[in-house]
Amino acid sequence: MSLHTFFVAPTGFGVGLTSTSLGLIRALERTGLKVHFLKPIAQPHPGDDGPERSSELISRTLGLSPPPAMPLAQVEHQLAMGELDEVLEEIVSRYQQAADGADVVVVEGMVPTRQSNYAAQI
């Protein structure tokens, strides 16, 4: 079987993106598929201090071990320095880690905000 990827994109902030990802993973697993998860770039809530929420929830709930998300501050710095290609290369590298041994990878996108208007570009 060839590898398939589902990109879960939000329509706005607080729309239940991680819940959707979790439900999609469980539904796919019930069909017998080996499903892995990737949140390429962390998007912390104000006041968050600790692991990226989506990956942590998926890990604790489903026992998966997704690659760590890139810290948002690092991504913003690299983009400000004109290093879009480097950011994209790192995302591809983390995707390849997530895809290892999987039939399906569920990739959770970023919520576009006024502060992260680059989210659609990535």
Say what each PLM segment does.
Residues 101-107:
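Loop/turn-to-beta-strand initiation segments
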